[in-house]
Design a protein with these regions (language model features):
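Hydrophobic Val/Ile/Leu positions in short beta-strands of Rossmann-like dinucleotide-binding domains
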Residues: 6-8, 69
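Glycine-rich Rossmann-fold phosphate-binding loop(s) that bind the pyrophosphate
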Residues: 11
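N-terminal Rossmann-fold NAD(P) dinucleotide-binding loop
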Residues: 15-16
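NAD(P)-binding Rossmann-fold cofactor-contacting core
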Residues: 24-45
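Short acidic-hydrophobic, aromatic-tinged amphipathic segments that line or gate anion-handling sites
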Residues: 49-56
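Rossmann-fold NAD(P) dinucleotide-binding segment
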Residues: 57-66, 74-93
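Rossmann-fold NAD(P)-binding glycine/threonine-rich loop
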Residues: 94-118
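Conserved anion/nucleotide-ligand pocket segment
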Residues: 124-125, 129-166
């Protein structure tokens, strides 16, 4: 069986977590990590994968089956999502709820033009938490749905605030 060849775009906490998840799945292999940093400064755990600049991405076309986009929803994904979906199958965790329809339209248009598939907003919320709410609401149709998400509660928003640090 051929393994699914994965590329990771962005190697922060999410990218590192994706690398660990890939290592635990026998049907996948990490092929490359793409970064805006100097590739020599990025140390990954997967010895068989390479680290490349974002500019080198297109040279890997045909060698990667799926790109996992690990950028932030505020500024990274709105730009990189459609750009990368034009050349690769992509999956991301875009989570700016109010902008999902616009983001979907942009990624879908680019992916279709390139003969690719772009799967968006597959994270905690939207994503796993959304599915949990859907299941609960289908059973408890008269119930009330509450979330702990609200204005400025997203980590991305908090980390961009003055005085925030890891």
């Amino acid at each position: 069986m051929d393994k699914i060849r994965i590329g990771i775009v962005g190697y922060g906490n999410i990218g590192k977590g994706v690398e660990k998840a890939i290592a635990r799945n026998e049907d996948m292999e990490l092929t490359a990590v793409f970064t805006r940093r100097d590739p020599a400064s990025v140390k990954i755990a997967t010895e068989t994968a390479v680290v490349k600049t974002m500019e080198d991405m297109k040279s890997m076309k045909g060698e990667i089956d799926v790109m996992v986009l690990c950028g932030g929803s505020a500024t990274d994904l709105p730009v990189m999502g459609p750009q990368i979906a034009a050349d690769f199958n992509t999956i991301d965790s875009f989570d700016t709820h109010a902008r999902i329809p616009e983001y979907f339209e942009n990624v879908d248009k680019a992916a279709k033009a390139g003969g690719n598939v772009g799967i968006i907003s597959v994270g905690w919320d939207p994503g796993m938490f959304s599915l949990n709410r859907l299941y609960a609401e289908s059973i408890l149709v008269q119930g009330s749905t509450y979330t702990f998400w609200g204005k400025a509660s997203a980590r991305d928003t908090l980390m961009r605030s003055a005085g925030s640090r890891e």
